[in-house]
Amino acid sequence: YQNRNGKPFSWDDVFPGYSKLTPQARSAYFLRDDLTDTEISSLKDYGADMSLYLPSGNEARLKAAYAQRDPRLAATVILPYSTYVGGSTGAALTYTSRHPYRRDTAPELDLQTRYTTRMYYWMRKFVARGTECQASEYTGIDMPVFRYADVLLCLAEALNEQGRTPEAIGYVNKVRDRAGVAELDSNTWTAVEGQDDLRQRIIDEKHWEFAGESGTLYEDELRWGVWHQRRFLGSAPGEQSEAGLKQVWGENVAPYIYAGDYCYRWAVPQS
């Protein structure tokens, strides 16, 4: 996700030299305040560069890094040190996503997940809160199949492919206005440089808008021919990709493996 003003986000702008660090070393930026000596020792063994750690300001510094991002990021996932109202005890309690995890009881009320030794971006979108549902296997939240935002972006794509790019921009901006981000053509970062540029911006917009949804994004990726690059970062068939299940600081815990280009076209039954 970009910044709210349309500027591309880079961790290097927040923490200079971030991308040159190993994922383990830069995990220090994501740690909770007031670590114990035991926690610090364990994190050093993991590879965290504790010279980067602020004992009493680490959480606030990290939260500030997310403050100006596209609001759809925080609406889609639970960000580090943000809260989530859970109901696992039978009562609605406010938990905070922290690392390392300690306990989900007072006074900490850390968000307990399936993997308490790791820190992921857990889903927030369409996840029940508090005591809205009695089991994680089902929810009363209706999952949209086709949203109005998709109608607008499909229309924008069709108009752009017809060469009606200025008209198409208006429909993309309807989605961006609702999301609370800068309109296209409103500043240097959002300036549209023609049909090809808007085509890519529509692809990006659909990913930001529909992340984590069960709508048409997968079919769109196949249709655009970007599924291999978007999901597997262009890795060769059978090889581990740089994409995968990652901790928030980028450690790839479970790399994806691309099966091959045949996935783009399903076989036609011969009988």
Segments and roles (model prediction):
Residues 1, 32, 117, 122-123, ...:
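Generic hydrophobic, helix-prone segments enriched in Leu/Val/Ile
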Residues 106-147:
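Active-site beta-strand/loop architecture of penicillin-binding DD-peptidases
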Residues 1-21, 107, 135-145, 169-172, ...:
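Long, intrinsically disordered, low-complexity segments
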Residues 57-72, 76-79, 86, 108-117, ...:
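Charged/polar interaction segments and conserved charged motifs
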Residues 1-103, 229-236:
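An aromatic- and glycine-enriched ligand-binding surface/loop that stacks and positions planar moieties
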